[in-house]
Amino acid sequence: MRRNSIFTKWWVKGSAVLVATAATLVFASPQQAIATPLKGVDSVTVSQSASNVVDIDFADGIKGRITFLEDGIFRYNVDPKGEFSEYATPRSKSHTAKIQAQPDTSDTYSKPSATVVDKGDAIEITGGKATVVLDKATGKMSIKSGDRVVVSESASLDLDKKGTVQTLAKEKSENFFGGGTQNGRFLHTNQTIAISNTNNWTDGGVASPNPFYWTSDGYGVLRNTFAEGSYDFGSTDSSTVTTSHSENEFDAYYFVATETGASNVATEMLQDYYKVTGNPVLLPEYGFYLGHLNAYNRDGWSTTSGQKKWETKGSKSSSEKGDVKYESGMSTGYKLDGTLAAETLNGEGPTVDTENMKATDFDRQFSARQVIDDYEDNDMPLGWFLPNDGYGAGYGQNGYYKTGGVNSDGTSSAERLNAVRANVDNLKKFTEYANSKGVSTGLWTQSNLEPDSNSETPWHLLRDFDSEVKTGGITTLKTDVAWVGSGYSFGLNGIKTAYDTVTTGANKRPNIITLDGWAGTQRFGGIWTGDQYGGNWEYIRFHIPTYIGQSLSGNPNIGSDMDGIFGGDPIISARDYQWKTFTPSMLDMDGWGTYRKSPMTHGDPYTGISRFYLKLKAQLMPYIYTSAASAANIDTGNGDTGLPMIRAMLLSDNSEYAASTSTQYQYMFGENFLVAPVYQDTQADENGNDVRNGIYLPNYGTDENPTIWIDYFSGKQYRGGQVLN
């Protein structure tokens, strides 16, 4: 197979009125019954207790408030109840995680003082470099950066009981970005996106929404809410933007750019978003290596027959036969009956409450340890390992299918807890072995976090998360339903709990991978895009703009399964290892597909190609980790603080072409690598050799002294300012 079109760039330098102010303005208007939309402004008052806060009385008794936080950041809240809650209302009182990293009163903010000016038909409210203009008659708002209007409402804010709708004017050349993990998209102009968890993992679905968007015209909006929403960026009316959330309050942070141009605006928008919601987490270095996930505590195995045949060819030719093992069970509730070997973490059987365990043996070849050995034997770099990723799988078999042991007050008996401790010790043994091979361990957090009060729960499936971290030594977590529910406040609270437990219990930076993210998720972990079918070009195609879009939405840490969790194909698998070498997270989600999901499954040339790219990623790790630090908003001295690892072309090129869908299948990986994955069959031969067209090479220099792009593998040079075919 030909290698992907991947270039590193070599930079070639070219020859290169305030009329009056008042604390309070009051206007006469007739008393009316409360109604929607807003019908006008009665008074505007600078708060006596905080000079950066402005209180607004709209007609019909509706209250509003503007809080200036920085030169280009303010909060606009219209609350019919007049309560102005500090934080968004969670979906449950038990959800304590917040969207914001700190309250508005924090000294983190400079809090510029506000001034209020009567302009006749309108009121101008200025704080720092941002000015909010309210129309007296309609309450319609517009925002200025200096003298430049960056956005204006084309209709009054509508506070209906069923939802709150803001209608904005859309400029012809204005482009829209953000919204979280919008599968298959990074540019949302003239489209409608769902700010809700659609549980659809393919093109057009939304895996981890984020109520944050920004535009090329110089403003961004973060809706401070956990309610579902919908953002129409000109789909219904090309001159109008309509954003709505299912709640009877408008609460939003506005980010106002001081500069123009897509790349400058994008940088400001991300910095402002991080100022309010917190910097992205810097994952541990091992988190950027390949991870392996499967269940090794549930099924039965044989070398002769079984429910599912798994063949591994390693470095043999893809045309030769490989090593074969057979697995049976693979579902919740499977119980060994004494005819098959048991899979285990360590190649060892249980020692506590073993009366229900019926297995022919506990052969190490069917263990999680053996899988680590497989990666080592095939010279494949591996960073982390989850041995319980499967329904009905724990991390030990002590108390195998034993139930009961629940006291009248819901606590567990000593015998029940002893089985849990024995299983944690089993996990600890596996962690120690994995660590000796340079591999970190973690768990899929599908079940409860501590021994539950259900007497019907088999003891070997009970969890003790605190002990898993402190004794078991895990530092990686992949969240699921029990942790993040449907997302929103449930999801944010779950991932914060996971982050806090590892950081306080183990005093280590965790590697947390989650689905159903929201605004603020970036403080705690990375995004996983969901369960998808591999084995087809579509799987690679739609993920490229997905990664770009997520990175423009404030979370630079993103990953997905190698060749999907289901299905599979040798060529697609190899191509996936190629391009995802130049992405943050890579997951071998094994046990569900047509083939074993690993880089050594299909034999050469596929095994060799996958090995080459995994080793290349290892060689590039200093570069990758430096880029990850920059993405975490850490100043590395390279001038790219706050920029994501996967960078849309518009982040370095202000041209209209770079900010269009013409560049949706390429990106910059860090500062110096342009990555253009092979994502379709253009004119492939039977071995998968193909070409890649439409590669845009920007020119940051001049026509006389252009940027030179160098093919990373061949050394061939290309002039910037062309589309390469």
Task: Please give the residue ranges for each predicted region.
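Bacterial Sec-dependent N-terminal signal peptides
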Residues: 1-17
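Bacterial N-terminal signal peptides
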Residues: 15-26
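Sec-dependent signal peptide cleavage junction
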Residues: 25-37
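A low-complexity, Ser/Thr/Gly/Pro-enriched, surface-exposed linker/loop concept
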Residues: 36-47, 67-121, 159-165
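Carbohydrate-binding surfaces of carbohydrate-active enzymes
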Residues: 48, 56, 60, 374, ...
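Catalytic and substrate-binding clefts that recognize carbohydrates or anionic sugar/phosphate headgroups
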Residues: 58-59, 79-81, 102-350, 354-360, ...
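Aromatic- and carboxylate-enriched substrate-binding clefts and catalytic-loop regions
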Residues: 99, 153, 180, 384-610, ...
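Aromatic- and glycine-enriched glycan-recognition loops and surfaces
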Residues: 263, 304-455
